[in-house]
């Protein structure tokens, strides 16, 4: 794999724009190549010269594996940073060149540090084609300054978060001791232990403010010495030296004229640190879990903070929250380390390409500047990683390093060959069963039998439920495949725990399994019905779909850790939040599940038919009076509007919390849909006034469909932007083929108006009415599958625009800030 593709594949998707634009810099190098080819038609000869030079270097005498290192050359000072205009260096490659037997070559660039970033001066701009190389270094500087600025901002953010975690750890240790030793405990033995994390955070925060390369290097040396002095559970002497080092860091910052906001907060916190037991007097429980009770409290404007209750149950909850916070924080640190490493590697690669193309020796000079910059020399993130690991292992994994590291660094989920094989096998079985079903219907002439209409009115709605479920699962599997292909971070958007998200193969496995079992039941039903020997067992024949539905429900709610338990519980949680919409804070997974339910209205009506057919009908003889029951017809309205009412309540909740008028318009969309669904249902039930209901249903359905289509394209997908650089689309597109978006918009419009069948009564002589209903419902599911892809693509691009790559993790304790300031 070429480096460019590997570089893109290793990026944090939400930070894509903050990385070095490798492809753009390559295009600048291609401009240099084009110019050289125009002005130097004997370019191949130049290439052979390099090959000859390469062969000559291979024929040099071997210098040995164990040799005395040459005397180090004293380099020029590289001091200076963003605070002033200093010359970073005019380096040369003399050391390496002498070793390789190459004549001394002076570097063609001069790098300066200004207040707004690093600037490179190309010293050979007067040469032919020098303007192209000048532009290249100008763009290179822009990319590096962008990368370093972003990295510095993110490091400052994690340092602030480290301060908060340190406070939480103080409270946790105090709370733990209070629970385990209610009669008192010698705190003096733990004072140093509790301040170690704060000491490192203070030193690291001070290093963030040191923007000069020289300052960063000096702090790096001090940090290494400090890390050697600190041991987990060290002596009071070690703690004292930590405080003294913090004071030294503060003096360095004052001398440099740099105000370290984060480190200042840490020093102030540590200077006014009360005795550890007094920490508990300043904190309360922060109830961040959304419940109906907390919702009612927020409406009544009551505080969600409660006094501390020292029990082992509360201790377990606090530890669980802090454990999750540390894991999330650790992932941030790892991504920051990866960001720094990948960008340094990318700059090294692009500079080597430049040297190869131009036969100059600029890479070493520029890379030395990078190594001495904040991006290359700061080690704050590395030190925090070490401290977080030590803290987590000691306090959250009982000093078991392997256990703690397995939690902090969960292993990547391996694709199992048996899943791939099973999915392919089930796909083949499904295809074979479909062929067998059509063959049985054809050979036994079932469509012309006397009970064909009765079968379609009773058994077909029962089995069509499984078809709707399987189709929706297959569409979701397709969504996952294309989300991964176009690097949509769906697991982050949905909030899946790392390692628990299902891949498209697992989802296909689930869908195909349900499809195979459903087809087996259908074939068994038809076979037993036709076979004279089993025709008498009417109860068993008719109960097959009920058995399958019951089995699916049991597997869905099974509490054991089998059949993808985390995914099943995630779905059930979102489903419950949809049913209790106004009482729970609306999250993206919750309203996405609600949107899926709006496309499964016919499946919900099939479940209603199950209850009526097996509860009050004579299922043995396929006789029921469901359509003649007033209660059943009333529930046709209720069941059909439940998903839309749920989404309407979610929109109202968000309107109340966020004060965003868009949520009000979104709620109006669902209200119009509720009216249209009720009118269409009334039209299909009330045969006495069908003409009036038909007109009303057509008018409101048209209004709702137009409103919903506009909302889909403009707000959910972010398309139809006339001023975009991609006309009528949006500025950022993940799918390179623009025609895909136009095709999707056309399909969404056509499939959105599939309701016309229910109003205009399209009938085909070869298709039963129940078959037509199933086809229309399937088209809506397909439309929803298409909608899902572009909806999450737009959400992902919104995260990219805000560089939002992490979830906010709620913390268990809430500090009284007034007390903090008072102390």
UniProtKB/Swiss-Prot annotation:
Pfam families, per database record: EXS, SPX
PROSITE patterns: EXS, SPX
One GO CC term, this protein: plasma membrane
Keyword list, A-Z: Cell membrane, Membrane, Phosphate transport, Transmembrane, Transmembrane helix, Transport
GO biological process, one term: phosphate ion transport
Residue ranges crossing the lipid bilayer per the database entry: 421-441, 460-480, 506-526, 543-563, 695-715, 740-760
Family, similarity comment: Belongs to the SYG1 (TC 2.A.94) family.
Name recorded for this polypeptide: Phosphate transporter PHO1 homolog 5
Organism: Arabidopsis thaliana
């Amino acid at each position: 794999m070429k480096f460019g593709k590997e570089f893109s594949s290793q990026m944090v998707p939400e930070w894509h724009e903050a990385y070095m634009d490798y492809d753009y810099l390559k295009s600048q190098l291609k401009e240099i190549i084009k110019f050289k080819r125009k002005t130097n038609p004997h370019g191949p000869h130049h290439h052979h010269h390099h090959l000859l030079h390469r062969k000559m270097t291979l024929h040099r005498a071997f210098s040995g594996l164990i040799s005395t290192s040459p005397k180090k050359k004293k380099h020029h000072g590289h001091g200076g940073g963003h605070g002033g205009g200093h010359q970073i260096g005019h380096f040369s490659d003399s050391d390496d060149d002498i070793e390789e037997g190459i004549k001394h070559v002076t570097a063609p660039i001069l790098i300066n540090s200004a207040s707004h970033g690093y600037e490179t001066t190309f010293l050979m701009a007067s040469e032919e084609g020098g303007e192209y190389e000048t532009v290249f270094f100008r763009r290179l500087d822009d990319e590096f300054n962008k990368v370093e600025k972003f990295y510095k901002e993110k490091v400052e953010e994690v340092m602030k978060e480290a301060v908060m975690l340190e406070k939480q750890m103080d409270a946790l240790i105090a709370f733990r001791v209070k629970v385990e030793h209610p009669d008192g405990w010698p705190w003096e033995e733990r004072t140093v232990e509790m301040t170690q994390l704060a000491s490192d955070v203070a030193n690291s925060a001070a290093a963030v403010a040191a923007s000069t390369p020289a300052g960063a290097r000096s702090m790096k040396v001090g940090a290494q010495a400090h890390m050697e002095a600190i041991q987990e559970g060290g002596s009071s002497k070690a703690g004292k030296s930590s405080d003294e080092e913090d004071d030294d860091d503060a003096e360095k910052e004052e001398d440099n004229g740099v105000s370290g906001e984060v480190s200042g907060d840490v020093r102030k916190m540590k200077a006014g640190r009360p005795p550890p037991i007094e920490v508990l007097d300043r904190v309360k429980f922060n109830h961040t879990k959304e419940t109906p009770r907390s919702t009612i409290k927020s409406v009544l404007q009551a505080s969600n903070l409660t006094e501390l209750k020292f029990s082992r149950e509360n201790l377990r909850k606090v530890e669980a929250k802090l454990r999750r916070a540390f894991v999330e924080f650790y992932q941030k640190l790892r991504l920051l380390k990866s960001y720094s490493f990948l960008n340094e590697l990318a700059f090294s690669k692009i500079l080597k390409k430049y040297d190869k193309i131009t036969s100059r020796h600029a890479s070493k000079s520029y890379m030395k500047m990078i190594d001495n910059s904040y991006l290359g020399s700061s080690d704050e993130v590395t030190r925090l990683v070490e401290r977080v690991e030590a803290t987590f292992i000691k306090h959250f994994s009982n000093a078991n390093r392997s256990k703690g590291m397995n939690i902090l660094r969960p292993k990547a989920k391996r694709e199992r060959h048996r899943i791939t094989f099973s999915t392919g096998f089930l796909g083949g079985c499904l295809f074979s069963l479909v062929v067998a079903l059509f063959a049985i219907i054809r050979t036994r002439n079932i469509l012309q039998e006397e009970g064909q209409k009765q079968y379609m009115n009773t058994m077909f709605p029962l089995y069509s439920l499984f078809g709707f479920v399987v189709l929706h699962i297959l569409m979701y599997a397709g969504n996952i495949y294309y989300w991964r292909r176009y690097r949509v971070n769906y697991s982050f958007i949905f909030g899946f725990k790392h390692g628990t998200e299902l891949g498209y193969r697992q989802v296909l496995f689930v869908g195909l399994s349900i499809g195979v079992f459903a087809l087996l039941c259908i074939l068994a039903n038809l076979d037993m019905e036709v076979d004279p020997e089993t025709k008498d067992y009417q109860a068993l024949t008719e109960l097959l779909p009920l058995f399958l539905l019951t089995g699916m429900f049991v597997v869905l709610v099974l509490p054991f850790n089998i059949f993808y338990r985390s995914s099943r519980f995630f779905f059930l949680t979102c489903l419950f939040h949809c049913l209790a919409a106004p009482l729970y804070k609306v999250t993206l997974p919750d309203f996405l599940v609600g949107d899926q339910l709006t496309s499964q209205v016919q499946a919900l009506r099939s479940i209603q038919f199950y209850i009526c057919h097996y509860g009050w009908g004579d299922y043995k003889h396929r006789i029921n009076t469901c359509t003649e029951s007033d209660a059943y017809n009333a529930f046709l309205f209720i069941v059909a509007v439940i998903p839309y009412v749920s989404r309407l309540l979610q929109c109202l909740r968000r309107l109340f919390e966020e004060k965003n008028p868009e949520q009000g318009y979104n709620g109006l969309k669902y209200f119009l849909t509720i009216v249209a669904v009720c009118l269409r249902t009334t039209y299909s039930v009330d045969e006495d006034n069908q003409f009036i209901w038909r007109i009303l249903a057509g008018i409101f359905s048209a209004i709702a469909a137009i409103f919903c289509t506009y909302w889909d394209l403009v707000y959910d997908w972010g398309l139809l932007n006339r001023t975009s650089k991609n006309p009528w689309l949006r500025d950022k597109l993940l799918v390179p083929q623009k025609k895909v978006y136009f095709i999707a918009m056309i399909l969404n419009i056509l499939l959105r108006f599939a309701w016309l069948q229910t109003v205009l009564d399209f009938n085909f002589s070869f298709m039963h009415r129940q078959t037509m209903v199933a086809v229309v419902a399937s088209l809506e599911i397909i439309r929803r599958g298409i909608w899902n892809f572009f909806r999450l693509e737009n959400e992902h691009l919104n995260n990219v625009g805000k560089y939002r790559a992490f979830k906010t993790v709620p913390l268990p304790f809430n500090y009284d800030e007034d007390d903090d300031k008072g102390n």
